[in-house]
UniProtKB/Swiss-Prot annotation:
The keyword Transferase does not apply. This is UPF0391 membrane protein Plav_0056. InterPro entries: DUF1328 (IPR009760). The chain crosses the membrane at residues 4-24, 30-50. Belongs to the UPF0391 family.
Length: 58
């Protein structure tokens, strides 16, 4: 999924350089969706990292 985020980021940069045509709205909305997906995954992994701390060795 990170690969696709990088691909859509590159598409967004190319579209910005070419003058913000019709491609921008599609790539920007996909990039925005991917941003929120990765933000949620980050928060979930952060919570699981705090909750699943290993106890002291026995």
């Amino acid at each position: 999924m990170l690969y696709w985020a990088a691909v859509f980021f590159i598409i967004a940069v190319i579209a910005a350089v070419l003058g913000f045509g019709g491609l921008v709205s599609a790539s920007a909305s996909i990039a925005q969706i991917l941003f929120f997906i990765f933000l949620v995954l980050f928060v979930v992994s952060l919570i699981f990292g705090v909750v699943r701390r290993p106890g002291p060795p026995r």
